[in-house]
Amino acid sequence: IRGAVAQNTTAPAYPQIKGYFSVLHPIATLDQDTVVYNFVDSYTVLVPVGLNLLKSDHIGFSFELAPTIKVENGQDRVTSLLFHPGILFRRNHGVTFATRLAFETNGRYGITPIFNQVVVKRTDVSYFVAGSLPARFGNNKPGTIGIAVQLGVNF
């Protein structure tokens, strides 16, 4: 048949395991009385690394660990380690909505909704940007909600 071309459109096999590495910058955190901005009196950065177990094109489970590093008055230190498991709701065009539980070694806990967008996709690697709204409670401190931006690589 003229114009007919055979196509090999094999669907990806699931489950799949993917890893990632990223850098997360908190922008601001709001508690009952104040807004604390990153980069003003101190600088805080998180370095999330994790594994995603993808069940299908639409859903997966993620296991993440993220050390928190704070630089203040010329001193830097790791202030906590975040255990951040969650469910991934994958959409079309590289968009993912993640719902994560948060357990920090400093005694805080909470939830983190995350909107993630793949911005560059290659055969073996993709680069993403994400925005998150972490809500934290516990450790005899007022509840907080923040906003953060994350840049990373999936492999």
Question: Over which residues does each language-model region extend?
Answer:
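Short loop/turn motifs that connect adjacent beta-strands in outer-membrane beta-barrel proteins
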Residues: 7-18, 53-59, 94, 120-127, ...
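Transmembrane beta-strand segments that form the barrel wall of outer-membrane beta-barrel proteins
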Residues: 21-34, 60-71, 94-106, 126-137
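Bacterial N-terminal signal peptides
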Residues: 1-2
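Mid-chain, structured segments of secreted extracytoplasmic proteins
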Residues: 57-93
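Solvent-exposed loop/turn segments connecting transmembrane beta-strands
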Residues: 34-43, 71-79, 100-112, 136-146
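Glycine/serine-rich loop-strand microenvironments at binding/catalytic pocket rims
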Residues: 7-8, 14-24, 79-104, 151-155
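Feature captures outer-membrane beta-barrel proteins of Gram-negative bacteria and organelles
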Residues: 45-55, 79-91, 109-129, 145-155
